[in-house]
């Protein structure tokens, strides 16, 4: 659920990038890569309508080139793209040089494929073959290949000591085992990897979150894309931190802990953290999908709030606990609804990320398993129906500010949940997840990451 990748979008950048990698793998397995002389890519639906603003075409080129979004140096991205565009050649899988004109070989088709709003088809041609494969980017960087039967729910559940599809099941396990939500999730993770691997991966995710927040707080200027959006995290951070010297993200955190913090400063710090992450995301920087790139700022902002303000003695164990709970709550939404704005609007992104952060924070504040899920429910309840209408198809307006609002709501939801007797709660998390999905299905496609309605129409690119 929490994955390291490159911005600006998990569904429109990371997903297509991963699809291109999967296509390369197929070509290698069929021993066709070295015989390929041409590759054609068709983008459909939302990938086509907002693909330019979301850098879908660039992601496809980078994926076909063999670059890994987790590890490729960010500074090399422009070099790779410029070389392909200027030379009209692409080194397929970093092995086979082919002719490739992005304007001709990547086609934006406005029509939608039936399975999902984010479809893309790759076609490889050689002297004696023509191989085609279609993928769907279903949100959060996850992809599905057309025609491949996914593992059944029963097969998936069989792999875990505590199989979970619904919040009710999660609570039942907590009661049966006398464990916190994070402990139940940890036991499930242990069926997939060692304790050392779990710890190392969670810390890698945390350090990526910290690094991108640090970069965002120390980078000024204007975001790319034509909206001329000025970065704000830099100025907010400068006003908050004062005249202090530090030489690393960790020393920076220590400096923040020493600042004078009252209610207004809390609001500003949380907003600053979230803006910083999403400004990095909007400039094709490296972030953690949480659960998406467009909502990547909420969870780091709330976690940083906890370690710098709420509990300045927080340890790696607290961070691990937070991420485990957040990931499980996100998984519940993915299984019961969607984490794709192209399917459910922004409630599927900021709404889900706010619910994830609220539940995770609630456990760290001492909330019971019931209160953790109440926190997640409160956060989502107040995002239901939120539209996805990015101006110019860019993950900037209103996306960046929405992360700040989602983070503040998450903190408030956690505090409300702590003060709630679970016996008096009226809306179970499973009900709000189902309601979110019904709302998503009822929502007009204009408000599902197509830039055909809402702010995307009301505010002209020329006005910016």
Question: Which role fits each region the language model picked out?
Answer:
Residues 2-20, 283-302, 346-354:
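Conserved phosphate/anionic-ligand binding catalytic regions in large, soluble enzymes, centered on
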Residues 239-242, 401-407, 413, 417-464:
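C-terminal auxiliary extensions adjacent to catalytic cores
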Residues 1-5, 270-278, 322-330, 376-379, ...:
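Short alpha-helical scaffolding segments that buttress acidic/His motifs in well-ordered protein cores
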Residues 196-313, 317-345, 454-464:
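Accessory "access/gating" subregions that flank catalytic or transport cores
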Residues 65-257:
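C-terminal regulatory domains involved in ligand/effector binding and gene-expression control
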Residues 313, 325, 331-404, 416-427:
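Hydrophobic alpha-helical bundle architecture
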Residues 266, 291, 295, 318, ...:
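Secondary-structure capping and boundary motifs in well-ordered enzyme cores
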Residues 11-28, 300-312, 358-366:
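Alpha-helical support elements that line or immediately flank enzyme active sites
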